[in-house]
Structure formats: structure tokens, C-alpha cells
Swiss-Prot record:
GO CC terms: eukaryotic 43S preinitiation complex; eukaryotic 48S preinitiation complex; eukaryotic translation initiation factor 3 complex; eukaryotic translation initiation factor 3 complex, eIF3e; nucleus
Organism for this UniProt entry: Salmo salar (Atlantic salmon)
Keywords: Cytoplasm, Initiation factor, Nucleus, Protein biosynthesis
UniProt xrefs under Pfam families: eIF3_N, EIF3E_C, PCI
Protein name (database record): Eukaryotic translation initiation factor 3 subunit E
Domain of life: Eukaryota
GO terms under biological process: formation of cytoplasmic translation initiation complex; translational initiation
Family per record: Belongs to the eIF-3 subunit E family.
GO molecular function: translation initiation factor activity
CDD domains in alphabetical order: eIF3E
Protein localization: Cytoplasm; Nucleus
InterPro entries to which the protein is assigned, alphabetical: eIF3e, eIF3e_N, PCI_dom, WH_DNA-bd_sf
Physiological role: Component of the eukaryotic translation initiation factor 3 (eIF-3) complex, which is involved in protein synthesis of a specialized repertoire of mRNAs and, together with other initiation factors, stimulates binding of mRNA and methionyl-tRNAi to the 40S ribosome. The eIF-3 complex specifically targets and initiates translation of a subset of mRNAs involved in cell proliferation.
Length: 445
């Protein structure tokens, strides 16, 4: 379903290495012509040192042609550079392999103290840090992400936050962990990178906006694979004003992922409050971005149009199954979305016959009653069943005055944030083309 595919938009904010998994996914889904995807891969590979991979793609794309001489020559050059960097880095790596050094690294959090220790014990010098960084980056460009992550870790613990390569090394470490699918380590690196960006007083507002936009896109890999990711994405994208502002200003298409995270959230009570805040954002941004997932929420919670909501839900299935980040959320999304339709319908009507519900849910009355009983039993639905009359009666929990004040205060706070963001949004004329230094090139196909 190419109409709703966001790969080209998302790839614009990713390092080129992170785009490869998306292209592999599209290839399996057969959304685009395979030759177009192979051309895209070859274009991405042209700026990396993954020459063997490029040769394989070239063979698949042009089976009748010889491998270009430029690729063969590049391979020789890359191998030569790798050997040279290995020779320069080997003595440095041996220092880190020393048991005493390992113990010192584990016991101290002070990079300067560790640097002084290495200088005293192993004659470590400042230029070694640049060598280590160059070697890590070269390993990354060759597709050796485990090596890159290891050397970037050594680099990170030694350099101060003011080092010219400090921020770039955090981007590289995060990318490496993502590409190795080490989600715990990636979550730690994501948190560290976010703190660095948020606490950076040197960057201009425009640079910070661009960095946050990149972080938002890279975080999708982590949030939709880490066990706590769907909670964290809501907290970051919806309730951190600077990141919500970045989404509204630079990348409203991210609302698809925020909406999916809210709908599939397992905390029922939290989800209801979050939905209210999400609906406000979706309404506000509906003129800049909409797809079946955001429209489903709008149909159900703004227009209370149940027929349109059912129609959009069917479209959501196609969107989810063809989205690299959301395909694993399909079952949770459909189950919870049906529950939302059912719950909203019942809340409007307060009392409804089971036979009517069965008809709406395409079930027999007995199946519908069992389904509702399970929802009540699992505390996912506040309702009672009158078996004699064959009715479902929705609960009407009284809200304390204190809770009402809290909710109204939250609402006022949220509206204030939105107002401030709209002012910033009108003032911001950010370029969407700048990339983190680690990537060095725009990506896309």
C-alpha cells in the first residue's frame, strides 16, 4: 500500500545505514518495484565502505554485467585503509584489554581521571582519542557495527562533553546498537543522547530542533522493539513540549506512531486520559497530516461516526502490516481499536442490548456475551451484564472534586503548551535538510 508508505519521509532523517532494514522490509512486502529498491540500495551504498554488499546488489541488479572496475578498486583501497587503521589502533586497544584498565573503567565515572590513569600507566596521549574515533567510524562505514560500538564506548568514557566528536560518537553508538538489535543498550544510548541534546547550551534553537527531529526518527527503532518503548514514546512525543513542537513543526507524520503507541498501550486508565490529549493534537494537525490511523481516532472520538471508524479500522490493517515499525503491533491495535469502538458506543447509549452488540461485532449473542464478560473480568471494561434482559449497562464512576480539579489543571497546562508551541511554530523556518555529522550525507531513495 504505497499510498500510505512513509519510508521516503522517514529515511530523510536517518543515517543511511539505518535505511537498509527499511528497504529490506519493503522488498519482502513487494510494495515497490524490486529494481527501484535495488537502485536505492546501490545509491545508499555508494557513500559507505560496504563494498562487498554493493557488489552483491550490483550483481542482482545487472546480472549480465561485470562488476565495475571502480568497485574493485574501491575494495582494494578500503582494505588498505582498514589495515593501516588497525595498525594505528592496535596498541590503544591493548591498553583497554588490560585487566587493571578494565577494572578502572568499571569503577570510575570520571573521564578525566581515567584519562590520567591511562596516561600514567600506558603513556596514553590526546591524539589516541582521534585515532580511536576514526577507527570506530571506519568500522561503522564497513558495516562492522559491533566493532564500532566497542570503540565508541571506549571513546565516550574518555572524552569530555565539550569534545568536538562527543555528540557524533553518541549518534554512532546509538546507530550501531540499533543495527545489532541490542535494544537495552540502544535505550540507554537514546536516553544519554537525548539528555545531551536537551542540556546543550551551545547549540542554536534551530540546531536543537534539527537534532530532536533526528532523535525522534531514530527512536522509532528502539521504542517499537523495547518492552517499555510504547510507554516511553508517549511520554517523550506527547508530554515533552520540545519534542511535540518538533513533531508539529518538522515531522507531523510521526503522529502515526504516537497514535499507535497510545492505542496499543496496556494501561487502560492511563490510555483514556492520554487519548484526550492525543485527540487535541490530531485535530490541530489534521490539516498537515492524516492517515487511516489518525483518522480512526478522529472518527471515533471527535465525530462519533462509528461506521466511518469501522471503515478506517479496515484501512488501518493495511497500513500497519506494511509499516516497518508497526507490523508487530497489528494484533494489539485491532483488538484495542475494536474495544474502543465498543466502549464508546456503549458510553453514548449507556444501555444496549447484547443482540445489537453481537450484530455490530459480527458475533453470535452468546459469543458477544462471553467476550464482554472477559473484558469485565480483566478490568478492561467498566460495565455490568443483565442476563435476564440481555442488556449491557455501562458503569458511571463518580469523579471526586479533587480529581476534577487535577484533570482541569492538566488540561489548562496542556493548552498552554500548545499555545506556546504554535507561537514557536510560526516563528520557526527551519531547514529540513541538515543531517547529524555522523551520517554526513542525506539519505533517501
Amino acid at each position: 500500500m504505497a499510498e500510505y508508505d512513509l519510508t521516503t519521509k522517514i529515511a530523510h532523517f536517518l543515517d543511511r545505514h539505518l535505511v537498509f532494514p527499511l528497504l529490506e522490509f519493503l522488498s519482502v512486502k513487494e510494495i515497490y518495484n524490486e529494481k527501484e529498491l535495488l537502485h536505492g540500495k546501490l545509491d545508499l551504498l555508494s557513500e559507505t565502505n560496504m563494498v562487498d554488499f554493493a557488489m552483491d546488489v550490483h550483481k542482482n541488479l545487472f546480472p549480465e554485467k561485470e562488476i565495475p572496475a571502480t568497485l574493485r578498486e574501491k575494495r582494494i583501497t578500503v582494505v588498505g585503509q582498514l589495515k593501516q587503521l588497525q595498525g594505528e589502533t592496535e596498541p590503544i586497544v591493548k591498553m583497554f584489554e588490560d585487566p587493571e584498565t578494565t577494572k578502572q573503567m568499571q569503577s570510575t565515572r570520571d573521564g578525566q581521571a581515567l584519562f590520567n590513569y591511562l596516561a600514567e600507566k600506558h603513556s596514553f596521549r590526546q591524539e589516541y582519542l582521534d585515532t580511536l574515533y576514526r577507527y570506530a567510524k571506519f568500522q561503522y562505514e564497513c558495516g562492522n557495527y559491533s566493532g564500532a560500538a566497542e570503540y565508541l564506548y571506549f571513546f565516550r568514557v574518555l572524552v569530555p562533553a565539550t569534545d568536538r566528536n562527543a555528540l557524533n560518537s553518541l549518534w554512532g553508538k546509538l546507530a550501531s546498537e540499533i543495527l545489532m538489535q541490542n535494544w537495552e543498550a540502544a535505550m540507554e544510548d537514546l536516553t544519554r543522547l537525548r539528555e545531551t541534546i536537551d542540556n546543550n547550551s551551545v547549540s542554536s534553537p534551530l540546531q536543537s530542533l534539527q537534532q530532536r527531529t533526528w532523535l525522534i526518527h531514530w527512536s522509532l527503532f528502539v521504542f517499537f522493539n523495547h518492552p517499555k518503548g510504547r510507554d516511553n514514546i508517549i511520554e517523550l512525543f506527547l508530554y515533552q513540549p520540545q519534542y511535540l513542537n518538533a513533531i508539529q513543526t518538522m515531522c507531523p507524520h510521526i503522529l502515526r506512531y504516537l497514535t499507535t503507541a497510545v492505542i496499543t498501550n496496556k494501561d487502560v486508565r492511563k490510555r483514556r486520559q492520554v487519548l484526550k490529549d492525543l485527540v487535541k493534537v490530531i485535530q490541530q494537525e489534521s490539516y498537515t497530516y492524516k492517515d487511516p490511523i489518525t483518522e480512526f481516532v478522529e472518527c471515533l472520538y471527535v465525530n462519533f461516526d462509528f461506521d466511518s471508524a469501522q471503515k478506517k479500522l479496515r484501512e488501518c490493517e493495511s497500513v500497519l502490516v506494511n509499516d516497518f515499525f508497526l507490523v508487530a503491533c497489528l494484533e494489539d491495535f485491532i483488538e484495542n481499536a475494536r474495544l474502543f469502538i465498543f466502549e464508546t458506543f456503549c458510553r453514548i447509549h449507556q444501555c444496549i442490548s447484547i443482540s445489537m452488540l453481537a450484530d455490530k461485532l459480527n458475533m453470535t449473542p452468546e459469543e458477544a456475551e462471553r467476550w464482554i464478560v472477559n473484558l469485565i473480568r480483566n478490568a478492561r471494561l467498566d460495565a455490568k451484564i443483565d442476563s435476564k434482559l440481555g442488556h449491557v449497562v455501562m458503569g458511571n464512576n463518580a469523579v471526586s472534586p479533587y480529581q476534577q480539579v487535577i484533570e482541569k489543571t492538566k488540561s489548562l497546562s496542556f493548552r498552554s503548551q500548545m499555545l506556546a508551541m504554535n507561537i514557536e511554530k510560526k516563528m520557526a523556518h527551519a531547514s529540513r535538510n541538515e543531517t547529524p555529522n555522523w551520517a554526513g550525507q542525506e539519505t533517501g531513495f
